[in-house]
Amino acid sequence: MDDLFKKIQQLIAAKLEIDEDKVTLDSSFRQDLGADSLDTYELVYALEEDMGIKIPDEKANEFETVRDAYEFIKSQQK
């Protein structure tokens, strides 16, 4: 696991009040992690603040798994 994933994993676990080990790249926000639409909105906002990036709403709506968010954030940090 790289540092970026670890940061994302910690943030998601804290926001959803779950164990970090439940957050994997292939975890579905809704099915595996139990996030509802409000949780997802709050996660996107927290990721934007923490990572110093802007995630367009249309892109955020495409985030189904942690990998989706990770890959987008990684692409913005180059």
From Swiss-Prot:
Keywords, ordered alphabetically: Cytoplasm, Fatty acid biosynthesis, Fatty acid metabolism, Lipid biosynthesis, Lipid metabolism, Phosphopantetheine, Phosphoprotein
Domain Carrier residue range list: 2-77
GO cellular component term, pick one: cytosol
The keyword Chloroplast is annotated on this UniProt entry: no
The protein's annotated pathway: Lipid metabolism; fatty acid biosynthesis
A Pfam family of this chain: PP-binding
Classification via SUPFAM superfamilies: ACP-like (SSF47336)
Compartments where located: Cytoplasm
GO biological process, one term: lipid A biosynthetic process
Recorded GO MF terms: acyl binding; acyl carrier activity
Modified residues (O-(pantetheine 4'-phosphoryl)serine): S37
Record's comment on post-translational modification: 4'-phosphopantetheine is transferred from CoA to a specific serine of apo-ACP by AcpS. This modification is essential for activity because fatty acids are bound in thioester linkage to the sulfhydryl of the prosthetic group.
UniProt superkingdom: Bacteria
Family matches, as InterPro entries: ACP (IPR003231), ACP-like_sf (IPR036736), PP-bd_ACP (IPR009081)
PROSITE patterns: CARRIER (PS50075)
Family statement: Belongs to the acyl carrier protein (ACP) family.
Function comment: Carrier of the growing fatty acid chain in fatty acid biosynthesis.
Annotated protein name in UniProt: Acyl carrier protein
Natural source organism: Treponema denticola (strain ATCC 35405 / DSM 14222 / CIP 103919 / JCM 8153 / KCTC 15104)
